[in-house]
Each structure stands twice: as structure tokens, then as C-alpha cells.
Amino acid sequence: MIPVESRLPFYSAVDTSSRENGMATAIKDANQARDIKQPKALPAPNSDFYELAETLNPAERSLVKQVRAFTESKLAPVINRYWADDAFPFELLPALRELKIGGLGLEGYGCRGGSQKLFGFVMMELARIDPSFSTFFGVHDGLAMGSIYLDGSEEQKQKWLPQMARLEKIGCFGLTEPLVGSGAAGGLTTTAKREGDTWVLNGEKRWIGNAPWCDLSIIWARDLADNQVKGFIIENKTTPGFSVEKIERKIALKVVQNGHITLTNCRVPEANRLQAGNSFRDTARVLRMTRYMVGWMATGCQMGAYENALLYSQQRLQFGKPIGSFQLMQDLLAKMLANITACQCMLLRLAELDDEGKLTDQHAALSKGFCTARSRETVAWAREVFGGNGIVTDYNVARFFADAEALYSYEGTFQMQNLIVGKAITGFSAFV
């Protein structure tokens, strides 16, 4: 198995010198046996080709190095086993808590804070080893915490965000329904009816990440009184009428646990209604913030696939040579790196716009669509490098290949992203 480790100069979170030397020696010896000249040293995989990580300040770079150390020393050794078992690695939560990355991009309330650029780099690092683990964190930190941060009352923020920032309470985000995905803005079938100081919720939510085991759910429902979308905080384990069934037999994002939520006369106090979440526009504020984070995750997915493919090409011998020495293989690797670099540059600028308060729905939509589409290309080329070995998880690339398909679809399909952009640039709405 080829571990996913990159030795970028500023990262160098894990000492890989002995493994590098061993790989180079093995290739050299094999090639000398065939009387083939071999370079003294092979370049280490570097998926930050334009050194964009250098745009981070020293404190941010230090945190990203810590995240990489966690993913390479803790996550990488166990992820294939958990992925194969459709299970979540709860054993890693204590080490994840030690990183103190809860609440990235959110200020106050015990949150880590920091720039959206830093948040993006962290999401990219997590996805570089496993996109489904990064999805777990993105749902909690971006969607669940973001909903309370943007749409909650001061009291709700004080109550929930500190616990969530410490990863003591984990959240999920319930918008998608069995028959409602792209049409959520005007088509939610989950309803909310107010009865005094209580709301009665009925309906179903599907594909909800973290739902089978998390502590609280952000549920979006249509108010029967005014037909507007309202947001609610539901405490999963203590709310009657709330139930979750784990979705089984997934072929992608197998580590993040997705659930089918059923709400049957589920009674939620008014105190748990998101006080500033009174229409889908308020929901969209959260999605705007998190949607382009999927672009960072898709880019991390590409990075992991590319780095695995490059290492493999340097040590796999065919016709007496490393396959990385063949023109067709170098063409694939160069195209992969170009995709990654294009996505990184786009996302870096988008993070700057977000930090400046200039991020728009169309900005987020363009990046989400573009980066996830490029990810599908990149991981397909990476799998091609491995040949038959690319369809087993031992070599990691099969996970990236499968997960890229899910990233392409969730938080808004590619086609819906293009319609958002199309409306912005033409002035015409093509939505049905």
C-alpha cells in the first residue's frame, strides 16, 4: 500500500526520509539490474505547485501543519478499514479535539475563528486523506454551527457554540428530503405548526450527515402559517417524535454516517427556533458560506489522488522502467496537477472575497461546480495510473474515485450551480 504523504517544504509534519530513501534505493537497484540509468533522487509529491500555502501567516501555517500531522499519523493508518466497514472512527475524536479547530471562521463563543482561507486549507487537508472525514467536520463546523452563528439568537449562540467548538456536542443539518433536493427553496414538505410556545414538526429528511449519532440537528421546515422556511434546533436524544435510521449500502463517503430523519408530531420549544432563520434567504446565507467549502474538499480529494498516483508511478516498473518515465503517464500527471492548481487559485481568491464580505451566491456556485467537476477528472486519471490496482482500497485511490462522485452532487448539483451562475451573468432565470 502506498501511504498518502506529501513532503511540502513548509509542512514536513512527518519524518519520511527513511521511506523516501528506501523507495529510491529499491527503484535504483531494480533498474541497475536492467542496466538502466536512474536519477539520484526522485522529486517528492507536491500538490501545492504554486506554493499557495505561503499566503498563510505563520500561525495559520502552524495550524495546517498540525492538521496534516493528525491526518497522516492518526487518520491515514485506519481510514481504509473504517471506510470498508461503513463506520466512523470515534477513536480519533479525542485527538481531533486537541487540535482546537472547532468554529473555524466564526468569531467569539469559544470558536477558533480565523480567516475563511484558513478554514479552506484545513478542509482541504482533511479531504486530502479522506473526503468523508472532512464531510463529517464540514457538516458540523460549517452547516450546523454556521446555522446557529448566522441565524441563532444571542442566547442560542451562548448555549450551543462553545460546546460545539470543543466538539463536545456534534451537530447535523437537515434540509434535504426524500423527494426534495434542488427544489428546497420553495418545495419543502416538512412542516412546522406553532401551538403556543411549542412548534410541532412533521416530515422526513434524508442524506443528513452525522445524523445517526450526533447530539443536535438543525432542521428546516415550512411554517404552515406563512409558508416561510423556519429553522429549529432539535436535541436528538431527548426529543419525542424524532427518530433516525442510518442509510446503508453507500458506495461513497462511507465514513461519514448519513441518516434518514423522521419527525412525527415532534414538539420543539419556541426557545429552540432559530430566531433569525425566518425564510429560505436565511438558510441560503448558511449555504453560501459552506458551499464553496465543498470546493476546498474536492480539491483535497484531488490532491490525495494525485499524490498517491505520483508515488505509484515512481515505483511501479513496467518494460524495465518506472511507469512515471513514460510520456503518456506524465501527460496524465501534469493534467491532474493543472486541475488541482486551477482549483486552488480559484478558491484562494474566493476566500479573500469572503473575508472581505464580498462573497455572492454566484461566486460560491461557480467554484463548487468547477472544483467538483475537475475532481471527477483528476481522480479518474489517478485511478488510470494504477490500472487494476486502482479498484482496491489498499491503494487509496479507489476511495477518492468514489467520494468525488458524491462531492459532485451534494450541496447543490453541478447543473444547479450553473443555473445560479447563468442567472447572474445573463439576467434571466432559467429555474423551473
Per-region residue spans from a language model:
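Alpha-helical interface subdomain recognition
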Residues: R7-R128, V139, G152-Q156, Q163, ...
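N-terminal glycine-rich flavin-associated loop
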Residues: T135-E155, A184
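A short, Trp-centered hydrophobic/proline-enriched beta-strand micro-motif
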Residues: L167-T176
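Conserved hydrophobic/aromatic beta-strand scaffold that supports enzyme active sites
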Residues: C172, T189-T191, L216-W220, G231-I233, ...
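Short Gly/Pro-enriched turn/cap motifs at secondary-structure boundaries
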Residues: L179-G183, W207-N210, R222-D223, K250-Q257
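Flexible, small-/acidic-enriched active-site or ligand-binding loops
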Residues: G187, T239-R267
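A short core secondary-structure module
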Residues: N202-V244
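A short, charged helix-loop
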Residues: G259-T283
